[in-house]
Amino acid sequence: MVARRWRMWKVVGSSVIFHYAAMRITKPNRATHTYRQRLCAPPARVFPLLCPVRETEWAADWLPDLVISSSGIAERDCVFITPDKPGKAIWYIISYKPEDWFVEMLRIVPKVTACRLEIQLTPNGDECFADITYSHTSIGAAGDEFVASFTADSYRKFMQAWEAELNHFLKTGSRLGHDNAP
């Protein structure tokens, strides 16, 4: 579908000259999955680790190229950039509510996908649950391939690996596979 819009081009004397432009509107090619992790610590201990800086403590192969933050850690309007295929991913924290154990981010890989990530922690005794939702929308041919490969099974495996890494850190204070690392 093509929608039309008018843009002001320039003002000449008392006349306004408009430029006609077109935009393409299409239905989204999107995949959304949610997974519930069971984490071996309460939300107050887990939530600070859901941060682009603190994640380097527990997640293998996680190292942002740049973090833009007034506090130096996760906060609303924090922006960070990570390596990604085929280039870089730009992340933006749009909601950061430590009092509710909730964080929401956007992740854009130009010409590939736009993603919304939501994480909600829920207390469960001395532990907590983390309900994690990724919603990927294609914004190009490479995104169509990615969305097709973002299956429930691939997401479950990704979430289980993340859960194992985070639980290992919560139990030992070290990254999985790095117990004896300096």
PLM regions: where:
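Short, surface-exposed coil-to-beta transition loops
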Residues: 32-34, 87-91, 112-118
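Hydrophobic ligand-binding cavity/cleft-lining segments
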Residues: 5-72
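Glycine-rich portal/gate segments that line the openings of hydrophobic small-molecule binding cavities
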Residues: 54-55, 66-110, 161, 165-180
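Amphipathic alpha-helical segments that line or abut small-molecule/effector binding pockets
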Residues: 44-47, 160, 164
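A short, structured loop/turn motif at beta-sheet edges
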Residues: 40-44, 95-99, 120-129
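Short coil/turn motifs at beta-sheet boundaries
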Residues: 28-30, 84, 112, 125
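Beta-strand/loop substructures that line and gate deep hydrophobic ligand-binding cavities in soluble
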Residues: 107-161, 177-179
